[in-house]
């Protein structure tokens, strides 16, 4: 008997189904950074906080005035795990102290990327989050089987080219789906 290799969702989007009850993930679009037999990690990319980069820089360097441009750089709620830890998803033309390459995209977790963005010498495209979404081994697969999520191919234009409130709908539309027309009820033929 042939066994199938597991299918993992690294470098894809997760679209929260309209009936998602968990307030951490209701109406979210999540980029999957890693997914393997040990579990999954993702970053919610459509939920801005009231914080901006200037607020973060004031905490990191209290003796320095952040550049005015940093007031316009939003900070996103990346997920409910380690909400005091920063993650920067960005274009790959720059690398920093703690950078991981993700198939044409990079993820940095060191402060130097924040300072580079503030100084105008950082990556051309970036999204900054505090916290991340984490799933134990088999947990995400179970949630997918329960129809809590849809997955779709990653598209950098959705993260970097659209306003945060447009991202979820655009990801669903890439599958030809209008989320407002979906129901949580499953039928059987």
From Swiss-Prot:
Domain of life: Bacteria
Transmembrane segments: none
Family: Belongs to the UPF0301 (AlgH) family.
A Pfam family annotated for this UniProt entry: DUF179
Protein name: UPF0301 protein PputW619_0469
Any one Gene Ontology cellular component term annotated for this protein: cytosol
Record's signal peptide: none
């Amino acid at each position: 008997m042939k066994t199938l290799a597991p299918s993992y969702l690294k470098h894809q989007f997760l679209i929260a189904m309209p009936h998602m009850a968990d307030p951490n993930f209701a109406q979210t679009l999540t980029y999957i950074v890693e997914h393997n037999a040990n579990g999954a990690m993702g970053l919610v990319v459509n939920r801005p906080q009231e914080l901006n980069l200037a607020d973060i820089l004031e905490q990191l360097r209290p003796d320095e005035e952040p550049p005015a441009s940093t007031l316009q750089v939003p900070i996103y709620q990346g997920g409910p795990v380690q909400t005091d830890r920063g993650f920067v998803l960005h274009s790959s033309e720059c690398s920093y102290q703690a950078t991981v390459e993700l198939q044409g995209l990079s993820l940095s977790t060191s402060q130097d990327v924040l300072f580079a963005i503030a100084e105008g010498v950082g990556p051309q495209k970036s999204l900054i989050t505090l916290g991340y979404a984490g799933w134990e081994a088999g947990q995400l697969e179970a949630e997918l089987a329960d129809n809590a999520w849809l997955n779709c191919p990653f598209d950098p234009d959705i993260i970097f080219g659209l306003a945060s409130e447009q991202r979820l709908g655009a990801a669903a539309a890439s599958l030809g789906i209008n989320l407002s027309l979906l129901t949580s009820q499953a039928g059987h033929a």
